[in-house]
Amino acid sequence: TTALEAGLKLIERYSVDYIAGPPDMTEAESAKLLEWTLAQRALYRTPKLVRPFDTTGADNIGVIELDETGMMQGDQAVTASSYCARIAGVLAGIPMGMSSTYAPLPELTAVTARTTSAINDAIDGGKLILVHDGVQAKIARGVNSMQTIPKGGKEDWRKIKIVEAMDLITYYLRTTIEGEYIGKYPNTYDNKQILVAAILSYFQYLEREGVLNPGESFAEVDYDAQYNWLRANGVDVSGLTRQQILEYQTGTWVFIRCGGRIVDAMEDFEVRFNNL
């Protein structure tokens, strides 16, 4: 565990999208890796842990849990713990406009046999499972381990693709603000608008790439947050116009609100054929 902690400390200097432990990881090391992942995500970093499903799920958007006991590669059995790194690599390589659902795993010749209802139950239970269609093995549905929707959260946060888009935005905002803005500009309204313009430009790029729905993205100085900050700091706002509140000095604080609609991938189809 000490060696793992030291290794995790070293990789904190890098940007990590997906991480998986070694096949021989102990329970204590697995718990430490989970703890590290959640702590990093609390700091607006974006690692996602791929690990074997245990008796209880992690119930977190940053944890993907592989529940497979019947994988074969030729005549060789493949364990979930040894295959998590492969899944992490697959997920890391999915283009931003696509999902991992039905991502092929051609080296596997067999996966855990499940009925249709068992497949659906596993997916609904936050487990990443595999299916074999008679031609090749593939990921059944790209879901993470989240089961409990947090306050302010949405059902589609259970999807790896949606969380990946959220993490793209989180990564951009964090690295841009930390690298280009903190301590580098006077805190004026005009300079806040420079940041707003940068965010909007990035959102427009994501719209072109199919990550965000075109025309719905926005970024602006947060009027409500400015208003509340001014009142909390003893400023009489009763005679101020909306624009005056937006332009008022806010010390070291910059309040921005932004958003957009994340686009999901095509995964569920209904096609009707009329025999004329």
Question: What function would you assign to each model-found segment?
Answer:
Residues L91-A110, A118-L276:
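Structured, hydrophobic secondary-structure cores that serve as assembly/anchoring elements
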Residues T1-P104:
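Extracellular Cys-Trp
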